[in-house]
Swiss-Prot record:
Name of this protein: 4-hydroxy-tetrahydrodipicolinate reductase
Gene for this chain: dapB
Top-level enzyme category: oxidoreductase
Gene Ontology terms: cellular component: cytoplasm
UniProt-listed PANTHER family: 4-HYDROXY-TETRAHYDRODIPICOLINATE REDUCTASE 1, CHLOROPLASTIC-RELATED, DIHYDRODIPICOLINATE REDUCTASE
Record flagged with keyword Ribonucleoprotein: no
GO molecular function: 4-hydroxy-tetrahydrodipicolinate reductase; NAD binding; NADP binding; oxidoreductase activity, acting on CH or CH2 groups, NAD or NADP as acceptor
Amino acid sequence: MINAAVLGACGRMGSLIIENITCSTDMQLVAAFDIGSIGKDAGEFAHVSNLGIQISDVKDLETVLKKTQADVLIDFTAAGATIVNAPIAAGCGVNLIIGTTGLTPEQRKVIDETIQKNKVRAVISPNYSVGVNVFFKIVREAAKYLSDYDIEIIEAHHNQKKDAPSGTALRAADVISEALGGKEYVCGREGIAPRGKEIGIHAVRGGDITGDHTVLFVGNSERIEIRHMAHSRQIFAKGAVRAAEWICKQEPGIYSMDDVLGL
């Protein structure tokens, strides 16, 4: 049985992840962390029966991870929190599932180096949906055949999302850029801005949109649109739990959802 711990346990993603852990036959929740609601039962936020696991203060992360003998820590919080907590977990020998977006290149480098130094396993991905990762694969193939088309990415999310553009949009741009040998990115346009051969990335924020991503390949007299729409955060939570079950069977190293799904 895999012992799982969850950061941000009282939040929208954390509570869904806990709900999905309770449905797993291979994993059990042994710890849940947040900055508030300390001492309350984690099941209260996941809308399941009492689990007997109290919310622990994230300040006690190291102590609780060691006490509960956690095998894996799932983190869908914020960049400022992940850069602090991921090294602590890795230092405890705990494997990581990181879905936090908005990490700077410098923060990602620190996390990668810590994982490698401590010889733990990690899946790091901007999106844990099976569909989105197939979307990346389709976009990559399309780019190979449409290299002379103008390429634009439009993403839309709820009005509480902190980072823009989304990690998924940036990953889509990376996938296209890799397929085409390198492309410059332009995030939004204003004023006099003649279009070059860049990839344009545009962010929309409003209401309760879970996540929409569209890649447009636009040529003269025609265009192709490849789109993924998320209807529920459940797809991200299910993917995270799937990744956590998978990672504990792998050799130490850093993996992506492509590896988890065999894409």
